[in-house]
C-alpha cells in the first residue's frame, strides 16, 4: 500500500504518519509513505506528479524482489486522498511513468475533498493558483471510464471536508460503472477517522476492518 498523508497540500511529512504505517503493517501489509513537495515550494499539479513518481518507485522495487505481481493499493487521508483519487481516475499522471490506473488493485480514501472547488476558498486558492480549468483538480470531474475499485470512508461529523464530497464522488464513480463502497462513520470527524486506524483509538470505529476487508476482496486483481 502507498499511503499519502494530508495537510492541505501545505504541511506534513511521512514521519508524522508512522503510526499509520505501523498500524497497517500490523495488519499484514507492506506500507510505503512517501513525502511529496508542498506549497509554497510548488503548486498543483506538482504534488500529484510527485505521487506518481512514488508509485513508480514502488513498482520498480517490487520488481527487484522478483514478485512483480504483488498487488498495489493507494490510500490517503484528506489532501492525500485527493491525490490518490486523481491518480486513479486521471491516467495522464501515470503516462510518463509507463503506468496507469489499471496497475492499481484499489484505492482507499479517508475524508477526501473529491468534489470541492479549490479556487473558491482562500485557504487553498494559492495552492491551485494558475489553474485554467478548475475541474482539472477535481477527481469527481476527471472520471473518464472504469477505474480501480474504491473504498471511500468519511466521518459524518467532518467539519473540515464535508462528507458530501464522498457521497457525490461515489455516485459519479458508480454512474461510470466503477466499483465503489462508501462508509460514513457517525461518530467520527476529520481527524478522528485517521486516528482510528491505530491504537489506542482503533476501537472507536471499525475503520481497519473496512480497510482489511477491502484489500482482501481485491488483492487478487492480477495487477503487474
Give the location of each predicted region.
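Short amphipathic alpha-helix adjacent to the substrate-entry channel of hydrolases
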Residues: 15-33
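C-terminal catalytic histidine-bearing segment of alpha/beta-hydrolase fold enzymes
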Residues: 167, 175-224
Amino acid at each position: 500500500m502507498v499511503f499519502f498523508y494530508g495537510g492541505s497540500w501545505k504541511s506534513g511529512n511521512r514521519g508524522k504518519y508512522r503510526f499509520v504505517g505501523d498500524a497497517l503493517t500490523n495488519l499484514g501489509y507492506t506500507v510505503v509513505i512517501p513525502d511529496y513537495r508542498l506549497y509554497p515550494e510548488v503548486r498543483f499539479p506538482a504534488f500529484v506528479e510527485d505521487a506518481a513518481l512514488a508509485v513508480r518507485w514502488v513498482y520498480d522495487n517490487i520488481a527487484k524482489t522478483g514478485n512483480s505481481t504483488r498487488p498495489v493499493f493507494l490510500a490517503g487521508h484528506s489532501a492525500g486522498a485527493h491525490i490518490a483519487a486523481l491518480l486513479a481516475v486521471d491516467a495522464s499522471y501515470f503516462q510518463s511513468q509507463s503506468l496507469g490506473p489499471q496497475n492499481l488493485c484499489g484505492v482507499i480514501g479517508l475524508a477526501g475533498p473529491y468534489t470541492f472547488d479549490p479556487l473558491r476558498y482562500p485557504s487553498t486558492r494559492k495552492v491551485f493558483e494558475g489553474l485554467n480549468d478548475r475541474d482539472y483538480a477535481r477527481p469527481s470531474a476527471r472520471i473518464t471510464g472504469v477505474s480501480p475499485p474504491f473504498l471511500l470512508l468519511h466521518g459524518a461529523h467532518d467539519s473540515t471536508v464535508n462528507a458530501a464530497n464522498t457521497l457525490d464522488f461515489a455516485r459519479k464513480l458508480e454512474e461510470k460503472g466503477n466499483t465503489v463502497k462508501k462508509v460514513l462513520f457517525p461518530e467520527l470527524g476529520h481527524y478522528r477517522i485517521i486516528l482510528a486506524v491505530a491504537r489506542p483509538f482503533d476501537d472507536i470505529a471499525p475503520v481497519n476492518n473496512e480497510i482489511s476487508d477491502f484489500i482482501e476482496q481485491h488483492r487478487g486483481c492480477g495487477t503487474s
